[in-house]
A protein has these predicted regions:
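Short, hydrophobic/π-rich interface segment
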Residues: 58-84
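N-terminal acidic, proline/glycine-rich, low-complexity intrinsically disordered segments
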Residues: 1-13
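Short beta->alpha linker loops
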Residues: 32, 56-59
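N-terminal intrinsically disordered, low-complexity tails
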Residues: 11-23
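Conserved mixed alpha/beta catalytic, RNA-binding, or beta-rich assembly cores of soluble enzyme
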Residues: 22-50, 64-68, 72
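C-terminal edge-of-domain segments
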Residues: 76-108
């Protein structure tokens, strides 16, 4: 965390990194605050129209799903409804391949 490519919408305990194309990836850990991640999701959706959320491990996936639900509430106040499309993604961390859950979030 502390990467120089993070946006203002990055939640404490989460890291936003540029992805392919225009989609940003928010990396969520089990220690991430779901409300802070939700604010980051809502901000990026408003600004760019879509965001991917990546989580590894049950606790991180739980926080990411809660954040998506909370972000939906924030965005509904602005008349924006979202959909969450889950998928698996293989990532390499410290030389070891891990499977992450990736949530692609976009307007409905």
């Amino acid at each position: 965390m502390g990467a120089s490519n993070m946006t203002d919408h990055t939640a404490p305990g989460a890291e936003a990194v540029p992805a392919r194309g225009k989609t940003e990836i928010i990396k969520v850990s089990a220690q991430s605050r779901s409300t802070a991640v939700a604010g980051a999701i809502a901000g990026i959706i408003r600004e760019r129209g879509r965001v991917d959320v990546q989580a590894i491990g049950a606790g991180a996936v739980n926080q990411a799903m809660k954040a998506a639900a909370i972000a939906r509430g924030y965005l509904l106040l602005d008349g924006i409804n979202i959909v969450v499309i889950p998928s698996f993604s293989d990532v390499v961390i410290e030389g070891a391949e891990r499977t992450a859950v990736r949530l692609s979030i976009e307007p409905r």
